[in-house]
Design a protein with these regions (language model features):
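Metal-dependent polysaccharide deacetylase catalytic core of the NodB/CE4 family, i.e.
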Residues: 60-151, 157-158, 164-165, 177-178
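Active-site beta->alpha N-cap acidic-glycine motif
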Residues: 2-93
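Short hydrophobic alpha-helical runs that function as membrane-insertion/retention elements
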Residues: 103, 169-172
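C-terminal active-site subregion of NodB/CE4 polysaccharide deacetylases
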Residues: 171-179
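Generic recognition of flexible, low-complexity loop/linker segments
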Residues: 11-12, 52-53, 133-136, 159
């Protein structure tokens, strides 16, 4: 899906309103899978997606807000040489001065709507803080809580939980909000 913003240049009588700020948001789609000993599994598809993320972060010259499960980045950092090298690429790209951001997510997948409906807002908050700590440890950059990419439906309770935890912008595809 492509959304186009039109920024009209002022004519002779219009005051200058500034340049149109441009940014990009992206999220990985690989799920976090745990093995029998509760270790995160990094399969070939996940590695390919994280490699693509590193490629994009290294290549673009505009700020990117990247939403990646902290457990995946932590598994890379604790993995073999190839995995650690990929984590180092992602960390370096997030800190390369372009203005990239890592968006906050819980340490392990926990849907805010499900947490709100089950009365587990404290657990969600704890896991969110743990995820932010993992991101800070693995990427040497602080996580941004103000924006959240929402790929699926979100309930009012889930949106309220995110709002109460500092989220100010929900970015979602048309299929989620256009009923």
């Amino acid at each position: 899906e492509l959304t186009t913003f039109v920024h009209r240049l002022p004519d002779g009588d219009d005051p200058f309103v500034g340049d149109l700020p441009v940014a990009m948001a992206m999220a990985t789609t690989s799920a976090v899978h745990l093995d029998d000993s509760t270790e995160v599994v990094l399969d070939d598809a996940t590695m390919a997606e994280l490699t693509h993320l590193a490629d994009v972060l290294e290549a673009v010259a505009i700020p990117v807000s990247a939403q990646v499960p902290p457990a995946l980045l932590d598994a890379l950092a604790r993995g073999d040489d190839t995995q650690r090298a990929l984590e180092a690429r992602i960390s370096a790209a997030l800190n390369n001065g372009v203005g990239h951001d890592a968006l906050s997510l819980p340490s392990l997948p926990l849907d805010p709507s499900t947490a709100a409906a089950a009365g587990e807002t404290d657990l969600y908050t704890e896991w969110l803080r743990d995820g932010e700590d993992l991101l800070a440890t693995t990427t040497n950059s602080s996580a941004r809580r103000t924006t959240r990419l929402i790929p699926d439906d979100i309930s009012q309770g889930g949106a309220r939980l995110l709002r109460d935890l500092g989220t100010r912008l929900l970015v979602m595809p048309v299929s989620v909000y256009d009923y």
